[in-house]
């Protein structure tokens, strides 16, 4: 009986581990960037840009503590940004591209492998989603008008999913797929930039100068 109980427990443990592993595999794979840019920190003498790039299955909320700790490693008064790719990455395509890189690039640097792998996964052919980002730098009172114009320009039978995010310099408007933007951009090209497989600034620290 004890043996049967142990066997049952072992089966349960194996199954739990299997479920955990499967859950991790099913989580969206995203590319992130922590960066303190030169142009954001011109007020600091002899400033040198810092950056940290990697792939992750964690959400922006789960990574906030990591970003805060990374920011604290910088200089006093340093302005730091946390970016996350709007589109999840295709794991299998990224693996294929990495294998090609390892085969054909004799100078592949193992020291910077993590950043290199993230760079490979960031290629547009490795995108698992097709979201677009509009970088909206107009005044906030124009935002609703812009979103309504997006809806009017999209002629598909299935409505777009639209997200709005505050950024350090304005707003980011993310749509769930592409559409014909010619009419939209003819009206808004002075204050809006379309960026397709782009990174979203999800958090920042310090005061921008």
Where do the protein language model's features map onto the residues?
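Positively charged, helix-rich recognition surfaces that bind polyanionic ligands
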Residues: 1-8
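Signature for HUH/AEP ssDNA processing cores
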Residues: 9-167, 178-179, 185-186, 200-209
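Catalytic nucleophile-His microenvironment captured as a short glycine-rich beta-strand/loop
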Residues: 170-176
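Polybasic, proline/glycine-rich intrinsically disordered low-complexity segments
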Residues: 187-191
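Extended, charge-rich low-complexity interaction segments
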Residues: 194-200
